[in-house]
Amino acid sequence: MKKQILILCNLIFLASAIDAKNLNPGFNIVEYQECICMASHFKELPGIEEKYLAPNPKLFEKLYSSPVMGFENAWELWQSADSIAAISLRATVTTMNSWLSNFHAGMVKAQGVCHFGKDINYKLCDNPDAMVHSGWLTSMLAMSDDILAHIDSCYKAGIKDFIITGHSQGGAIAYLLTAFLIEKKSSGFLPKDIQFKTYCSGAPKPGDYAFACEYEYMTRNDRSLSVVNPEDWVPEVPLSIQKINDFSKTNPFAHTNELPDTLGFINKIKIKFLFKSISKSPRKAEKKLRKYLGTKVGNILEKEYDTYQKPTFGQCANYARTGHTIIFKPSTAYYERHPQNSKDFFEHHMYRSYYELSLDCDY
């Protein structure tokens, strides 16, 4: 009898931790644990050993698993007893094309047209100069029609609160999907009373600094949480290359040809030479990244997918993190289980690692 009462009390506590009538802003540890558990239990998650997985979700039930779409992408729809829907986006799997989506890191405009089977018009933010990762954008857009159709079905069934979540590649796509859906809501395509809240777990950088600023404004008031294990290298990629012309338009570096005469002729020459030498290496590095991770990977994907047409890539690789960052600081006990010098370079990135950290965090 005591055991039954204890179980009942635990269920009441867990259910009250997520309030469907008001999907509150800010980090909620129970919500996050459900998200990492959902990410860990896709219908098809090949090549992942049991020891790397988190437990099954406690509060959410799986309603739908999508077919494979885009560059070996998939998503699932979950629902809680309190009528919160969760859109869970799959992480990278072991297939070549799934990894090519990650490596297709040339940047494209955050608004435009994607050519994959059909022309897909998209807008992720208002800033026409903002740029995002090409591979993950294409992956998101390939799933977008299916996701929108299920959001519509949920809304007609009375569900208005949606959690968007993903781990690793799924987290990167979750950023872009969130921006896409917020713009759909702003344009009137989606109802105004729909609420979105996002948990990106162990996610890479989705776009440039301009997009990061736009995204953080769009999800202000703690509507998008980015959970990071500081020992995990994945949130540090793609590599960021900042050029002089990546700065905001009003900056001192744009006017080195207009230095005041009070500096003197020799000093002006020295300053111009310094800026020229500093800016040369980033320009070359960005150009090389665009060539290989944009054009060449795009060529491979065009051969893999007859209906895919690679985009025109922007001259930018100024990748930046975004969202409200939640740091899971590892404890001594964590390091005993997951050593820093592990030969497994995904040791600190897997579902189990993040789940264990969530049990120790003091949020």
Question: Model features per residue range: what roles?
Answer:
Residues Y64-P67, A81, A91-V93, S168, ...:
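Short, flexible loop/turn elements at secondary-structure junctions
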Residues M69-G70, I173, G207, T219:
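Short, glycine/acidic-rich beta->alpha junctions
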Residues K21-I84, R90-T92:
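N-terminal low-complexity, Ser/Thr- and acidic-residue-enriched intrinsically disordered segments
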Residues L176-F180:
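Active-site signature of alpha/beta-hydrolase-fold catalytic machinery across serine-
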Residues L63-F162, S187-L190, Q195, N221:
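A conserved cap/lid and substrate-binding interface adjacent to the catalytic center
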Residues G166-G170, A174:
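Gly/Ala-rich beta-loop-alpha elbow adjacent to hydrolase catalytic centers
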Residues K21, K118, D145-D161, E183-Y363:
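Serine hydrolase/lipase
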Residues M1-L23:
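Bacterial Sec-dependent N-terminal signal peptides
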